[in-house]
């Protein structure tokens, strides 16, 4: 643990340690984060708390979920700082917040330290809670995280507070008794004074103090103590103890930690989904080639490209896409659009920002962030400004912008996916029905995505440039750390909405590609059979040269998008029949066959009549086979590295292939995925997509 002692000559300014924290891949860091999140016990020592642990305690209801344990080795140093305060006062020492007033009125003096702490809590209990649905209470998850982080800070022994108070707050955590804190009212410098004063208010038994019981009831301080098993009655605070609890950044940094846990997972998920986007769009995977990204030097982009490259290298879709893209190359764009082709370059900087913000927040939750700092070894009370939560405000502003940019890319990809002019042969709006005139698929969902994205871009605006001078111009610059963290929480929630919607759309596209291949196979089989029946023989009984047109007929089918004709395959207004007829006419005009012209064109007429009779039945049979799971052509997703994600959505969450006929709405399915993401259920399927990745790009051959 960092603390008193000689200056580290090798890294006196801590830049080396900060750089070392960024070693290794972002994915490995996320895996460690998830592992820490799943630990059943969090033992806090003062300087080793991790973002994943904060998120775990926040989400757990009590010790049955995650237990919190104090490091007993911290007891002597905590006791030493508490005793130093009392000894200093006894010898006439003058310490801010102990013998003086607060903030802009610190010129005032008092010898009644305990009474000063009571007044500190009284005047800081300035929050408004409201009632019912209009309430302004901080979510219990955030309060639990704040309690954990505050204990961690105070455990370092620089704050002048008794160990017994930290034990009491820990008991509240472990028994699921959560103080009620106001949602608003802090500028996170001097720390989160107003919300933290309500934690202090509960342990001192203030009459307005309330808590949420394990069964969700609001209870007063007395019942809260009883439920938590805290004996000995309420605490009467010694000098400095109230200030130690309230004068710190723990609410802002705690919420920031929980937000960054989710943000890191969503960042990796966005990389995986960009690869799936390439799969369903029949994209060109060369955009992930390592040389391209190596030459640009940015580690975030290099890793994003390598992750996408890994998924695409193990994808059955890509071998099929290669054949599709090699057909008539001069009639197709040479490159994919930016939303796909530059996705590593777009996501990379966002991941770098998110990673840096995470490390900044992790440093903050392990910092001593109150004032004054008690240096027992030198016998000093150091009056400084560690309560200034600027690392939180700036990190949250930066992270929120990165989150908004991830959402912007997701919206761009989604917009291509649902647009038949850009989606390389998928249906308009990803409609899955037989009749596209009665199925508008994801049209409403695209409108919702536009709404989500617009709000997310608005939230990307910074908070920290809206600082107001406060408290008699003593707090004339302040961080707005908790405010920024709250807005980042909103941004993460909206990105979850977008991600959920996008995943449902991608799974729909996967199944449309499966349907497309089966319909195309049925069409080719049907055309082959009809061609053999109609085109093989002349009326004279001789072999007809028209039989040699079969290969060209199949090529014409390959060139035509299945969903451009699947709802009415024999319509003269749709391209399939037009192209097949053109093949036969071209053959008749160029074959030099001695067969009479009338016979040639009668064959074309007969060919089309036979198709009109057989083809709709074959296409319907293909649809039924796909729906029943008996399709002859397997779904390529099964042989792709992205399959774990698809399987989870389809099998575990029970999301279905959407059609207008089923009446199941897109929102119902998106909600299932949203809940899955919010409950952390998507983490393992996401990581399973990357379980074979060795952390390196493919070799440049």
Curated annotation (Swiss-Prot):
Alphabetized Gene3D superfamilies for the sequence: Fumarase/aspartase (Central domain), Fumarase/aspartase (N-terminal domain), Phenylalanine ammonia-lyase 1, domain 3
Pathway: Phenylpropanoid metabolism; trans-cinnamate biosynthesis; trans-cinnamate from L-phenylalanine: step 1/1
Binding annotation for (E)-cinnamate: 247, 335, 341, 371, 443, 471, 474
GO biological process, one term: cinnamic acid biosynthetic process
5-imidazolinone (Ala-Gly) crosslink, residue number(s): 189-191
Entry EC number(s): 4.3.1.24
Any Pfam family hit: Lyase_aromatic
This protein's UniProt keywords: Cytoplasm, Lyase, Phenylalanine catabolism, Phenylpropanoid metabolism
Function: This is a key enzyme of plant metabolism catalyzing the first reaction in the biosynthesis from L-phenylalanine of a wide variety of natural products based on the phenylpropane skeleton.
Name of the featured protein: Phenylalanine ammonia-lyase
Lineage: Eukaryota, Viridiplantae, Streptophyta, Embryophyta, Tracheophyta
Name of the gene: PAL
């Amino acid at each position: 643990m960092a603390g008193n002692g000689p200056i580290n000559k090798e890294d006196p300014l801590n830049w080396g340690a900060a750089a070392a924290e960024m070693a290794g891949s972002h994915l490995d860091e996320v895996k460690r984060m998830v592992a820490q999140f799943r630990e059943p016990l969090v033992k806090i020592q003062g300087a080793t708390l991790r973002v994943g642990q904060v998120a775990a305690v926040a989400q757990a209801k009590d010790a049955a979920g995650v237990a919190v344990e104090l490091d007993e080795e911290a007891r002597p140093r905590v006791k030493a700082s508490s005793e130093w305060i009392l000894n200093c006062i006894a010898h006439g020492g003058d310490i801010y917040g102990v013998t003086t007033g607060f903030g802009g009125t610190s010129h005032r003096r008092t010898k009644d330290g305990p009474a000063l702490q009571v007044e500190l809590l009284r005047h800081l209990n300035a929050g408004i809670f409201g009632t019912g649905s209009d309430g302004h209470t901080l979510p219990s998850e955030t309060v639990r995280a704040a309690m954990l982080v505050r204990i961690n800070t105070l455990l370092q022994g620089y704050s002048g507070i008794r160990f017994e108070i930290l034990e009491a707050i820990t008991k509240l955590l472990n028994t699921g008794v959560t103080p009620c804190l106001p949602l608003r009212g802090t500028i996170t410098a001097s720390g989160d004074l107003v919300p933290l004063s309500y934690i202090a208010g509960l342990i001192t038994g203030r009459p307005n103090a309330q808590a949420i019981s394990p069964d969700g009831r609001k209870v007063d301080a007395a019942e809260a103590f009883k439920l938590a098993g805290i004996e000995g009655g309420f605490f009467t605070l010694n000098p400095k103890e109230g200030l130690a609890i309230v004068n710190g950044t723990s609410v802002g940094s705690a919420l920031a930690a929980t937000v960054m846990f989710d943000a890191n997972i969503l960042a990796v998920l966005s990389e995986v989904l960009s690869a799936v986007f390439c799969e369903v769009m029949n994209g060109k995977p060369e955009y992930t080639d390592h040389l391209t990204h190596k030459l640009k030097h940015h580690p975030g982009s290099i890793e994003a490209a390598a992750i996408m490259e890994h998924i695409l290298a193990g994808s059955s879709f890509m071998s099929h896409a290669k054949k599709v893209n090699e057909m008539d190359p001069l009639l197709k764009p040479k490159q994919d659009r930016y939303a796909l082709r530059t996705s590593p370059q777009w996501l990379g900087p966002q991941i770098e920002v998110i990673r840096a913000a995470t490390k900044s927040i992790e440093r903050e939750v392990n910092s001593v962030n109150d004032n004054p700092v008690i240096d027992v070894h030198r016998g000093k009370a150091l009056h400084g400004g560690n309560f200034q939560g600027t690392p939180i405000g700036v990190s949250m502003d930066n992270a929120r912008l990165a989150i908004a940019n991830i959402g912007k890319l997701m919206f761009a990809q989604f917009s291509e996916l649902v647009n038949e002019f850009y989606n390389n042969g998928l249906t308009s709006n990803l409609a899955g029905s037989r009749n596209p005139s009665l199925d508008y698929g994801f049209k409403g969902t695209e409108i919702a995505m536009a709404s989500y994205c617009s709000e997310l871009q608005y939230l990307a605006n910074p908070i920290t440039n809206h600082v107001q001078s406060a408290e008699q111009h003593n707090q004339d610059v302040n961080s707005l750390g908790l405010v920024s963290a709250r807005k980042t929480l909103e941004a993460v929630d909206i990105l979850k909405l977008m991600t959920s919607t996008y995943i449902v759309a991608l799974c729909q596209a996967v199944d449309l590609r499966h349907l497309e291949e089966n319909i195309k196979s049925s069409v080719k089989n049907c055309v082959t059979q009809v061609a053999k029946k109609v085109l093989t023989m002349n009326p004279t009984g001789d072999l007809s040269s028209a039989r040699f047109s079969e290969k060209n007929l199949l090529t014409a089918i390959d060139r035509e998008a299945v969903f451009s004709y699947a709802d009415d395959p024999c319509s003269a207004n749709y391209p399939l029949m037009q192209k097949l007829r053109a093949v036969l006419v071209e053959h008749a005009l160029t074959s030099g066959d001695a067969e009479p012209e009338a016979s040639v064109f009668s064959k074309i007429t007969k060919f089309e009549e036979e198709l009109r009779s057989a083809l709709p039945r074959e296409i319907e049979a293909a649809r039924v086979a796909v729906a029943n799971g008996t399709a002859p052509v397997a779904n390529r997703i099964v042989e792709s590295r992205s399959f774990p994600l698809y399987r989870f959505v389809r099998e575990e969450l029970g999301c279905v292939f959407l059609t207008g006929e089923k009446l199941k709405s897109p929102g119902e399915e998106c909600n299932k995925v949203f809940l899955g993401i919010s409950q952390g259920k998507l983490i393992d399927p996401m990581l399973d997509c990357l379980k074979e990745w060795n952390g390196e790009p493919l070799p440049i051959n």
